[in-house]
């Protein structure tokens, strides 16, 4: 696997963009569109089920994941969000994206100690929206 940029550089680029007038929600939508496009490319022209679960932190990485599954839901995918983290620490962007997830009636599950790995059984694509 080749890495174009690492997480540290990505954060610097984001910070520079925001400091120079680019709203963070615009950056988030762009990231979500790219993620959704990758998922569509993976499922295009094959027999993969279009079932996607996004594992989301309560920060802006998680907000990117929520936005991505919202876009995929609009394109006919079966989507679910699994939220990991304390909602009291959620960023404003995350809360805004979560509101949109509820509007689109996308199921949301909050991580609990008794969640088992079988939560992933019905999903063939997992979006990592925890790590940057």
Spans of features found by a protein language model:
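Positively charged, low-complexity intrinsically disordered leader regions
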Residues: 1-50
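Glycine-rich phosphate/dinucleotide-binding loop and adjoining beta-alpha-beta core of small-molecule
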Residues: 1-5, 46-132
């Amino acid at each position: 696997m080749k890495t174009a940029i690492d997480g540290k550089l990505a954060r610097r680029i984001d910070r520079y963009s925001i400091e120079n007038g680019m709203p963070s929600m615009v950056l988030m939508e762009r990231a979500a569109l790219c993620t959704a496009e990758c998922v569509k490319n993976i499922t295009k022209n094959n027999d993969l089920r279009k079932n996607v679960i996004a594992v989301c932190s309560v920060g802006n990485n998680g907000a990117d994941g929520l936005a991505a599954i919202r876009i995929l839901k609009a394109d006919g995918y079966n989507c679910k969000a699994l939220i990991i983290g304390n909602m009291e620490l959620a960023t404003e962007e995350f809360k805004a994206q979560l509101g949109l997830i509820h509007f689109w009636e996308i199921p949301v599950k909050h991580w609990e100690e008794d969640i088992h790995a079988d939560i992933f059984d019905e999903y063939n694509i997992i979006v990592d929206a925890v790590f940057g």
